[in-house]
Amino acid sequence: MFASFIFSGDNKLTEKTIFNCGDLDILVVYYTIATQFRKFLPHYIRWHLYTLLIYILPSFLTTEIKYKRNLSNIHISGLFYDNRFKFWTKHDKNLALTEEEKMEVIRNRGIPADVLAKRAHEFEKHVAHESLKDQIPAVDKLYSTKVNKFAKIMNLRQSVVGDLKLLTDGKLYEGKHIPVSNISAGENHVVQIPLMAQEEILSSSASDFKTAMVSKSSKPQATAMHVGAIEIIIDSFASPDCNIVGAMLLVDTYHTNPENAVRSIFVAPFRGGRPIRVVTFPNTIVQIEPDMNSRFQLLSTTTNGDFVQGKDLAMVKVNVACAAVGLTSSYTPTPLLESGLQKDRGLIVEYFGRMSYVAHNINQPQEKDLLEGNFSFDIKSRSRLEKVSSTKAQFVSGRTFKYDIIGAGSQSSEELSEEKIQGKAKQVDARLRQRIDPQYNEVQAQMETNLFKLSLDDVETPKGSMLDLKISQSKIALPKNTVGGTILRSDLLANFLTEGNFRASVDLQRTHRIKGMIKMVATVGIPENTGIALACAMNSSIRGRASSDIYTICSQDCELWNPACTKAMTMSFNPNPCSDAWSLEFLKRTGFHCDIICVTGWTATPMQDVQVTIDWFISSQECVPRTYCVLNPQNPFVLNRWMGKLTFPQGTSRSVKRMPLSIGGGAGAKSAILMNMPNAVLSMWRYFVGDLVFEVSKMTSPYIKCTVSFFIAFGNLADDTINFEAFPHKLVQFGEIQEKVVLKFSQEEFLTAWSTQVRPATTLLADGCPYLYAMVHDSSVSTIPGDFVIGVKLTIIENMCAYGLNPGISGSRLLGTIPQSISQQTVWNQMATVRTPLNFDSSKQSFCQFSVDLLGGGISVDKTGDWITLVQNSPISNLLRVAAWKKGCLMVKVVMSGNAAVKRSDWASLVQVFLTNSNSTEHFDACRWTKSEPHSWELIFPIEVCGPNNGFEMWSSEWANQTSWHLSFLVDNPKQSTTFDVLLGISQNFEIAGNTLMPAFSVPQANARSSENAESSA
């Protein structure tokens, strides 16, 4: 009863067993014995004996142990079972102390005073746990019945019965733990949900004897029950730690249509231990009949059931709460049932650590079901025997009544058109006439052709074959002297799509919402003894004289193509990354841009110029948005970061190429930075790590062969290192016409995360960030002249982890920099610095003014003197300029630093700050502040960036007349309020989408702005 010991196969609690146990286990044994023994003693001696067993006897036994036990490395396991709270505990201990050490501890310290007190507290806490109760609400909480005054005074419950024979009109029925058949260990099993015991239904069935015995004064017997709640209790026999998951369908078998029959779907783990409790509120009136228990059924199945076939997986029992419904009375639901539970429809009781899912089927009639339904009435009376003569009679058929109500959608428009052509006047035409003719007092069609029935307002995406969906064809000249970096064509995508007249050309121009992606198929045939690398890139917008470098244009949607390896190139893309639809007018007004450039020139010069043909289609594949939540990176994180073009000359010399993985700060040299949207997102974080997926493309003739080894290492390794391939590496060898290879380096190859941005002047020795190495494994050789050239692009980062926000570093390294991470705190990035004119003439006017474009990164000043302005290339500043679409909260901080030489008592400067959507005077201010604090002040406020494209906004776009956010300053006495710094921060919900092609950003340096050059470009 108290305990059982498992010790070397012996299950007896002997003196030898006790003295071979550790002291802690002895205390547990005596504590268990004392606790159990205490409840059998009288109250007045219970605590005296309990104290004796708990405090005195263990101390005595511990002192005696040193003479009897032989300590060694013994492993014992104790299992204790308590009948009061059904609680198993396990104690494992390795005894490895010497006898002298153990006895010395006991002799000096004794038994800790609070050990037994803590165990007693834990015991009482477990004893206080309540049992697993039924979760079905009480039936009198679901229904309201009439209760006489005496019952109200005595606080009596409503009339609740548990026997069908006593169930009369107005009474409530409550069934507890009605047994149900067990669930077998199979893929599918059907369990009937009884509403009451089957023997009660049979015993209460109507008979002649019972009809004769019913008293006239008795209440009428109930003919039906309103089922308010059913609780299905499933006790699984499976292990409590198994992964069996079951799905259950609650089915109303009186419906034959599955859309009406399936009431609810429940998914829950079929683990043992605690029961599965499914509570549903059917809100169904069930007729009392012998087959009433077969109406509701529970269909169960398991996806990964490993229980032995033929064995029961679980037992099932049911609780029900119903109200009797008869000819003279009905039920009255309480607000709890009608307004609360019936809206929930059902639930699964979730215990701690157990997940469950519930779905309910609702198949209510729609308006079209009422208008288009056909109703037919065909009623015949019974035949009757009529007397014809005194010697003859015959059966006469009864009268017949037939009437049809035909719905509006019962006849197709094709049938109606055919009837009109044939000149047949049908009765059904009357319901189609839409205008009243005063002459004939009837409804007439407006025209001979029923335009109201024609689908002229079809807004669906064009559909059909590839020929039906072809919208345009473009021809791209590829001269025989083309070299790397040549721009073959750079134009708006709308201009590409409006070339030619094909079947879908008109659909493209006249459809408001096109949900299919744009598919381009480029073809050209060139011989295999030459090769060329072309890039087709799509970007959401373009500003100014944007750079067409492959690093800048390939970040959104780009395909690298070597026609010598692949004769045809196919690419599908979504031109609206914020949503799932687009239109031609949208492409025109947002400036969606297409670039086709040559990345690597001809391996061998062809004899004539070449022409590439590009066919444009509307794809049947639907558009999928791709947005970036800046502070919560998606998985996978689409980057499309160009790592570089690697050239390996023919021969046996070992060439080593390094590509830095600190890729967040853009690419460039000391005086300029190339930046795109995904890299700007990465630059928001301080450190990052993840699984890196690279795409390696062959950019020369397939006849040039080489095996290249790729591995990760630090950048300070010398080129003549002899054991490069001691690192984990991947060998790449292209097939005959193979064009691309995908490489993946997991984060297991990186010890920690690394910085996203490194100063340009940092040496390789002091870098400390990993590099991607590419090295010739054997040799590069061919029968034709030319180098072996490959292009490397970092396409996605999987399982990315980012740490800390990045304030930013001025400048960029020559092939890129590195990503950073997230934090809840706001880290401010400096965007702009403005110094009022030093040569300001206060005799002409007492104020000056300037404006900062917060989203576009521009500064506008007046002509009151020589201004000093500075636009910083901070991470947020870069992000706002290269992200085409933006949505979310942007934090703005303005810091004014005044002339410190002015005394506080002499301060006489006032600054007014205006927040507007445009610099035009016709726009009202969104907010206005007035600051007059001497020497310095701060202003912090949020801006909610939101726009028309699924909440995203594009900077100063003609589409939907989008503008920007401008912060204008009116400075009175600018010789005192001199320097203004504008800083930006983003919130957790800030999202971006699409890339804007931008010119290279110059490394910021203080520029003296004259009055003639009054506006700063982005």
From Swiss-Prot:
Keywords: Capsid protein, DNA-binding, GTP-binding, Host cell junction, Host-virus interaction, Inhibition of host innate immune response by virus, Nucleotide-binding, RNA-binding, Suppressor of RNA silencing, T=3 icosahedral capsid protein, Transport, Viral immunoevasion, Viral movement protein, Virion
Region spans: Involved in tubule formation by the movement protein: 401-407
One of the GO BP terms on file: transport of virus in host, cell to cell
Transmembrane segments: none
InterPro entries: Como_LCP, RNA2_polyprotein, Viral_coat
Pfam families assigned: Como_LCP (PF02247), Como_SCP (PF02248)
Site (Interaction with the viral RNA): residue numbering on this chain: K463
Cross-referenced Gene3D superfamilies: 2.60.120.20
Keyword Ribosomal protein: no
Transport is among the record's keywords: yes
This protein's GO CC annotations: host cell plasmodesma; T=3 icosahedral viral capsid
GO MF annotation, one: DNA binding
Superkingdom of origin: Viruses
Site (Cleavage): Q446, M447, P819, Q820, Q1005, A1006
Name of the protein in question: RNA2 polyprotein
Organism in which the protein naturally occurs: Bean-pod mottle virus (strain Kentucky G7)
